[in-house]
Amino acid sequence: MRKTIFAFLTGLMMFGTITAASASPDSKNQTAKKPKVQTGIDTLLPDYKKQLKGKRIGLITNPAGVNTSLKSSVDILYENPDIKLTALFGPEHGVRGDAQAGDEVGSYIDEKTGVPVYSLYGKTKKPTPEMLKNVDILMFDIQDVGTRFYTYIYTMAYAMEAAKENGIPFMVLDRPNPQGGNHIEGPILEPEYASFVGLYPIPLKHGMTIGELASLFNKEFSIDADLTVVKMKHWKRKMDFDDTRLPFVLPSPNMPTVESTFVYPATGLIEGTNISEGRGTTKPFELIGAPFIKSTELEETLNSLHLPGVTFRAASFTPTFSKHQGTLCHGVQLYVTDRDKFEAVKTGLSVIKTIHDLYPEDFEFLSTGSFDKLAGNGWIRTKIENGTSVENIINSYEKTLQQFSKTRKKYLIY
């Protein structure tokens, strides 16, 4: 079932309007490509019509909040005569997805709907009572990517807190984990390293849907919101995003493809170093490199490790923004050749340790402490600096990972 080489967006978009009357071969081919899975926004209005009638809705969303026909959640709610969309809330990158990572997004009036849009990234990460004064139900419809340091899940957590504090029900419109729901990897975040790229003690790769995470956050971390998860239909844990046949809309500017979501928990750690993680290229998180790296040397060394489900190709690139902007970088491109066997965190740690060992005079962990925040602790960086093997590092967190796995099972919906 799994593909050995990723299918790109064009393969995902081959579905359209299907007419029941047609029986032509072309129609059959189109039907075969029809999405298997219905997300929360698809099941919301049919399943919760009575509960929503006459309610004022606040919606936290971004461009990836679409139904199976690519219609925006904003438009779906705004056009429904039985409810009133009264407020929009934008996470990092904004409701329309037009801001780069780290850019603050201001509040404004949405041009299409006339609904006020409030930013939840920057100084204000939690909806205020003033923002919620005309809201009866607060909804969340954003595509997560299954990695702890992707900030949308903490936008959700803060919004759940605000809903609890203001006596407002909170609804999560569930969506697939693009990486599937069976694999968990990586160290558990230690509380002293909590930040907006890691708020709670969960593993780096959690293997949960956004709705399942909401349930876990709500109970395990005592948010206690009046939470409803609007479930998907037909999603199975073994499915990656391609298996759902849903259209993939990039959830953030540097997450352009399904392939990006798979490599992100590996090379996202590189953001905490002086190595480019490929921002400013057309292959963010797939391309990694720096001016001082020798591409062929790195390619050969990494491939000699025989890491499962991944192959490295020597590559050079010039980032148009972010680290090493306008400077020729040399490194590798990652190709995930088997999604089921690929171990993202092991791969990421192996890449960082290999570059550290090959270029000790040039490689650096950033002085901002960002690597420790991404890793969720300080000891992984120390172990890499001290020459500890990747296997030893992984063994150091396996016990706590297994403990989390037991807790996680209580909140699995599918």
Curated annotation (Swiss-Prot):
EC number: 3.2.1.92
Stated pH dependence: Optimum pH is 6.0-8.0.
The keyword Ribonucleoprotein is assigned to this record: no
Signal peptide: 1-23
GO cellular component terms, A-Z: extracellular region
Chief location bin: secreted
Subcellular localization: Secreted
GO biological process, one term: cell wall organization
Disrupted gene: phenotype observed: Deletion mutant accumulates specific cell wall fragments and shows growth defects under starvation conditions.
Subunit structure: Homodimer in solution.
Family: Belongs to the glycoside hydrolase 171 family.
Domain notes: Contains an N-terminal catalytic domain and a C-terminal auxiliary domain. A putative active site is located in a cleft within the interface of two subdomains.
Record's function text: Catalyzes the exo-lytic cleavage of beta-1,4-N-acetylmuramate (beta-1,4-MurNAc) from the non-reducing ends of peptidoglycan chains. Specifically hydrolyzes the natural, peptidoglycan-derived disaccharide MurNAc-GlcNAc and the artificial substrate para-nitrophenyl beta-N-acetylmuramic acid (pNP-MurNAc). Requires a MurNAc entity at the non-reducing end, and cannot cleave GlcNAc-MurNAc. Probably plays a role in cell wall turnover and recycling.
Name of the featured protein: Peptidoglycan beta-N-acetylmuramidase NamZ
Annotated organism of origin: Bacillus subtilis (strain 168)
